[in-house]
Amino acid sequence: MRIVLITGISGSGKSVALNALEDAGYYCVDNLPPHVLPELARHLANEGQNRLAVAIDARSSASLDEMPGLIRALSREHDVRVLFLNASTQSLIQRFSETRRRHPLSGSPSHDADVGLLVSLEEAIERERDLVAPLAEFGHQIDTSNLRANVLRTWVKRFIEQKNDDLVLMFESFGFKRGVPLDADFMFDVRALPNPYYDHELRPLTGLDQPVVAFLDALPVVHQMLGDIESFLIKWLPHFREDNRSYLTVAIGCTGGQHRSVFLAETLAARLSRQANVIVRHRDAPVAVDASSRLVT
């Protein structure tokens, strides 16, 4: 059975991700107590169901300590994938303010003895980060701070499409002016490269468009940087495999996330596609939703 566990910070988009998986044919359960998961998986398998998605958050805090061992045990019998959603505190505060929802850890002592005294929204967010942090190392992280809901749905679908028999290498382009991604394992700053933005004909285009590709591809300094990043990754990928890493996210950043970072992310994804399962995604580039994330074969 394919089991997708969705966890992370409240307000980061777990409901959006769960809905995307439901649309993809998964049997979905929100806020399932972790200790019930093995029994549910057995029951659904006996019923002929082969895809299950479960959202787990800090409301299950009493059982979160069991999750690492539970994930290992389930992985021996099933294809288990963990998706960890995160977002900046500023983004989360804005989302809770807009929806007027209460954070699950900002309760009063009369309703939640484990939480204690009523805390501010920011304190509740930081407390939840501490509670769910151990789960981040088991899964693929997505920083949803600057993502629209339809883009997140596309990224989730790409996540479940990739094979689970090898390391998944994720290249993510972004713009520094919108903040650095929280999900990056490695981050490369390519702002030192010549910027197509200053060519008025190239300014409205992206690193996916042929004129921008031709501009950057003609520059020796661009190929030097590409070669250095590629050599670094090729050297260290075997060590990450030996460490049983399932996912590795490499973020490539330029000023706006539109030209240079997109071109380098695409080029590196193509070059490394024989070294690992590769996904490339573009956080800030003004591209079509389907082009914002894709498998590289």
Swiss-Prot record:
Alphabetical UniProt keywords: ATP-binding, GTP-binding, Nucleotide-binding
UniProt-annotated binding residues for ATP: G8, I9, S10, G11, S12, G13, K14, S15
Binding site for GTP: D57, A58, R59, S60
SUPFAM superfamilies given in the database record: P-loop containing nucleoside triphosphate hydrolases
Organism: Burkholderia thailandensis (strain ATCC 700388 / DSM 13276 / CCUG 48851 / CIP 106301 / E264)
GO molecular function: ATP binding; GTP binding
Record function comment: Displays ATPase and GTPase activities.
Protein name, per record: Nucleotide-binding protein BTH_I0482
Family according to the record: Belongs to the RapZ-like family.
ATP-binding listed as a keyword: yes
Highest taxon listed in the record's lineage: Bacteria
Presence of keyword ATP-binding: yes
Matches recorded under InterPro entries: P-loop_NTPase, RapZ-like, RapZ-like_N, RapZ_C
